[in-house]
Amino acid sequence: MIAFAKQFRVRISPQKARLVCQLIVGKKTADAQNILSNTPKKAATLIAKLLNSAIANATNNHGMNGDALYVFECVANQGPSMKRTIPRAKGSSNMITKRSSNLVVKLSDNPNERQELIKQQKALVKKRVEGQQKAKMARQKAVTSVVKAPSKTQGGVQK
């Protein structure tokens, strides 16, 4: 079972938030909290609050054991950005984009659930690649059969 918490329009760049997200994926929640409390980044405090919210959601709403939870996924996607101008020389101006993030933390009580999902995705990709290879071979076969078709003319002279 997966429990999650979301937070939108967080005033931090998604590139900076992803660095912190990568630290906690696959860890136990207690370990993740320790990592986040010792990480000297602004994103660490924001993700720590979101992690605590996800833990509360898992225990209160889904009846999961808080000690047996793992961080299944931590995602920092791009949110809307605020555009500001800064004056430059000769009456011109440049744009400043103040980026925001949409954060999602997902928790699971099964530590092998992530590996199972990865195996399923790899199987789907393999199946898709095999289908593409079959289609490519069929196209090549069709092209070669058109090329090998006997012609009615030989050297410009009809028979």
Swiss-Prot record:
Matching InterPro entries: Ribosomal_uL22 (IPR001063), Ribosomal_uL22_bac/chlpt-type (IPR005727), Ribosomal_uL22_bac/org-type (IPR047867), Ribosomal_uL22_CS (IPR018260), Ribosomal_uL22_sf (IPR036394)
Domain of life (superkingdom): Bacteria
UniProt GO molecular function: rRNA binding; structural constituent of ribosome
GO cellular component terms listed in the entry, alphabetical order: cytosolic large ribosomal subunit
Disordered: annotated segments: 129-159
Keywords from the UniProt entry: Antibiotic resistance, Ribonucleoprotein, Ribosomal protein, RNA-binding, rRNA-binding
Pfam family, one: Ribosomal_L22
Known partners and oligomeric status: Part of the 50S ribosomal subunit.
Function in brief: This protein binds specifically to 23S rRNA; its binding is stimulated by other ribosomal proteins, e.g. L4, L17, and L20. It is important during the early stages of 50S assembly. It makes multiple contacts with different domains of the 23S rRNA in the assembled 50S subunit and ribosome.
Protein name: Large ribosomal subunit protein uL22
Organism: Mycoplasma pneumoniae (strain ATCC 29342 / M129 / Subtype 1) (Mycoplasmoides pneumoniae)
Lineage, highest ranks first: Bacteria, Bacillati, Mycoplasmatota, Mycoplasmoidales, Mycoplasmoidaceae
